[in-house]
Amino acid sequence: MATMKIKEWFFQSKKALVIGILAVITLFVSFTFTPIAYAFDWYEFLGLKDVDTEKVVAFLQNEWIQYADFLGSIWQSIQGGIIKTLLYIVSALEGLIPDTFSFFDILKDAGLNDFASSIIKGLFYALFVLVIVWLGIRTIIQHKPPRFKSVGVNILVMIGLLGGLNELMADMQKMSTDFFSETTNTSKAKDGLAWDLVKQNTADLIYLSKTGFEPIQSKKENEPAISSTDSKPKNGMSKDIFLKAQLGDVVTPKVIEMLTSQKDIPKETEYLVYKITNDGDKETVEKINDSVFNPFKDKFPGGYVRYPMNFGTIFWGLLALGVAYLFTVFVFVMTIFEIAMKKIIAPIVFVTDIETGEKTKMVIQDIFKGFLVFAFTGLNLRVYTIIVNYLAEKDINAFLYIVAMVCLTVALINGSESILKYFGVDVGLKEGKNHLTGMVGGAMAAKGAIKGAGRMFSGAKNLMSGGSGQTREDTPKRSEMDSNHESAESQGEQKNTAKGGGMQAKKFARNTGAAMSYAANRGVGGMMNDAGNKVAETVGGAVDKGKEKVSGVAKGVSDSVKGTVSEFKGGQAEGKQKAQENADRQTLNTIGKGIQNNANAGIEPSASPKIANRPNVASISNERQQGNIKGERQTAEREIELQNKLRNTGKEEGKQGNVKSERQTAEREIELQNKLRNTGSTEGQQGNVKGERQTAEREIEIQNKLRNTGGTEASQGNMKSGSQTVQREVNVLDTLRSTGGTGTINSDAKAGVATIQRDVNVQNNIRGSEAVDSNVRAGSTTVQRDVNVQNNVRGSEAVESNVRAGSTTVQRDVNVQNNVRGSEAVESAVRAGSTTVQRDVNVQNNVRGSEAVESSVRAGSTTVQRDVNVQNNVRGSEAVNHTVRAGATTVQRDVNVQNNVRGSSEVTADVRVGTTTVQRDVNVQDNVKEVRKSRLRPRGSTQNRTDQLRRR
């Protein structure tokens, strides 16, 4: 029983028991073996008892001593393969340059020399005689004859050059080629500049372990030696040995042990069996074979890279040299051909230039410079290699090294400015670059031409073989190959026909027609204007590249021809329409610029601006008994800020009405963009003006103070509209006496800054039994007006007028009905501020017939549409029509007034006012029995009361 309990406890406490046992063992080991390990001589254990660790660490920290394991050996092999490839290519290009010198043999060619000799023999005497004759003529004719002394000297020089030109050119050739060879090949490395660059930046540890490590060791403290220019090289390899060597080889400890067994081996060779590690607080070394961090040491033992190299220096240097050699080949070949041409041209120049000798000197200089190109190009390449090796010796910043290499490469391609300045020889390789790019472009063009010819041949072969030209896309799927196979084939044929030449011809015809019509309608100036403003779109189209597949069906060809004609006509119509649109746009831009300039200069435009004849502009016609004006929808965008203060006063007087206005002030800043389109037509006996809804965006702040008094108004119509930004001050003074006449309104408009002042005083004097006076006052931001006018004159008619205004909407209907058999007088004065549109409408009708007058004006939120139509029937059947149109930024209003006299009529007017919307309905009916001419003096005269007040 006890045994079972012990076993049960053991299994339940198994985890805790194991942890306790491990803790006890750890404590025992730490207290027992730690002092022993601390007192242990690790240097003796690692075999470093007799080794100067500091010297070994300093030697192994050299940049040329690079430790590599299995992966490091692979990376070194990749770098070596890249360097070998570049060296092989650059060496091949470098070997082409001496081969280009073989083209100098053309100067010794028998054919070229025979050709030059034949030219000299055939032309020498003839040209020489002609030159002598010409000199004689010039001596006789010219005021200053040629200098015969210089002519004689030039003849002697000519004879010497003709006889010794070949020998002179041969000597120049030999000197230039020898100079190039001596500058590009040093006394130590005869394999060229490319191999010299690689040799100076590559080391061989096996070679250095025999000869000494001085070439890679620092000569000064804290100055690592990357390259050495001493007599001892870093390696003893030639170019062939380097190309065959395994650049990923690693020097293992076994190899070092074999080397150290030999005599006269440097002591530093023994250090290569160690690698750098640390003992916890400082760097130390350990033997490579004893390293526990190399799991592949049995199969791939670690060691030091045998062929360490400056990969970046060699890579960029070989790349720059390869580009330079490639361009140099083109430069040398072109220079040799130019020298050969100068050899042919030189004798002709010598004979014809015996007067001054300037051209002879020029030819000799050009030949001399041509040969100097070879010599100085070699010098330029050699200096480049020396500077690259110098940069490799210095321990400089990586960024500065890259900048220096880029500058050196650019200088190598552009050439030395010093050589160009002092010798006049351009040793740059820009011409070679241009020739190379031209050759590449020509090769690409030839390749494209070959492909195009192949496509043409393939298409012609398909056409001649009677093939339908069906493509993979046109082939029906297997699931679609059912009973409708025949219809599918017919659809495929139609598709192929459309994709063939028919569609191409139609497209070409359409584009051609559009281009011709556009050019004919716009002209050269219009086309240039469209191109400058980027308005016109590209009309012409190039014929698409590709295959032209024609099915050969006669019906398809016929349809294609017909379609081509129709497409050409359609293109003409499109071109004409496009030209008209561009012309209209140009006209609108011109008008807009003129209005803007006038507004900036403070010039007020005329009251009746001219509008271009457009099919969308309204036209109003008159008839004797019928008149109706309808306005189509107008849209605009406005941003308005308003502050209005209005105060109106009115009083009731006797039979004669007198209207006096007090000044009203307001400040407005308006920016308008309006697009107006109005149409008008005439209808029955009564005129009705209806405005459709107008939309806009406004931001308005209004402060209004209104006080209105009702009275009588006379009938006289006059409307004046200005631009959007108009400043007017209008003074109207009408005087009507009781002798039975009708007063005239005199209005004067002046522009202010941003203020609107309006005084409206209405008094009604009626011989009937009723008179209505209504005062409407509005607060700062809300306008509410109720106007009720009832007049009973000689009959049973009643007139009602209700004016109601909301907070943000203004609607005004004014209905005035006057039956007057006496004389009335009406005075109205309206003054406007600087940027506000001021409108004066004065209507006077003296009618003895049965006419009726009705006028309705409604305006939307941001767009005002007003049609003004005045018809007067006076003692007969005459009709008067008055239309006022505004400019580009001006509000247009149409007012229709008809007078009905001696009858019974009823007038109803609703006026509603809001802050941001103005809607006005005006209906005026007057029954007048007497007609008199206006006695108001014309504006501008000395008797005019308004002008007199203004002068004061």
From Swiss-Prot:
Residues 471-488 have a biased composition (Basic and acidic residues). NCBIfam families: conj_pls20_p028. Residues 617-628, 677-688 have a biased composition (Polar residues). The chain crosses the membrane at residues 17-37, 86-106, 117-137, 150-170, 314-334, 336-356, 371-391, 396-416. It is a multi-pass membrane protein. Keywords: Cell membrane, Membrane, Plasmid, Transmembrane, Transmembrane helix. Residues 461-504, 617-636, 677-696, 932-952 are annotated as: Disordered. It is found in: Cell membrane. One of its GO terms (cellular component) is plasma membrane. This is Uncharacterized protein pXO2-14/BXB0013/GBAA_pXO2_0013.
